[in-house]
A protein has these predicted regions:
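S-adenosyl-L-methionine
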Residues: 1-55
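Conserved proline-anchored active-site loop of SAM-dependent methyltransferases
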Residues: 29-30, 40-55, 71, 75-99, ...
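Secondary-structure junction/capping motif
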Residues: 20, 69-70
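Structural alpha-beta junctions
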Residues: 56-61
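Conserved acidic E/D residue at the C-terminus of a beta-strand in Rossmann-like folds
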Residues: 43, 62-67
């Protein structure tokens, strides 16, 4: 990552090389999704729950490999997949997301 960008990241867990998404970015991201009230949401990379806790629905699930709920083992029906996945495995994340056949994938 460019040092000019890296210093602006407010929260980072260097032990796991995790970057946490700021709440204002999550709110903007979620505001761009056209959803129905009964949609089932999935946050495949829960982290601290910043996406999950701001989903506009109670019909939601999460995955988090650090909590033994690996997204790559997830096979339930879902309408919307939304999160900020690790870029190091982004291609695999997209493949798995498409396999689940949601109506919306938003990363």
């Amino acid at each position: 990552m460019l040092s000019s960008i890296n210093h602006k990241i407010k929260k980072r867990d260097e032990s796991k090389d995790i970057f946490y998404t700021p709440l204002n970015v999550v709110k903007i991201h979620l505001s761009l999704i056209d959803f129905f009230n009964n949609d089932k949401w999935l946050d495949p990379f829960y982290g601290e729950g910043i996406y999950y806790n701001n989903f506009p629905s109670n019909n939601k699930e999460w995955c988090e490999i650090l909590k033994n709920k690996d997204f790559f083992d997830y096979n339930n029906d879902v309408d919307i997949i939304c999160s900020n996945p690790p870029y190091s495995i982004f291609d695999k994340v997209i493949e798995k997301s498409i396999e689940l056949k949601p109506r919306i994938i938003s990363y």
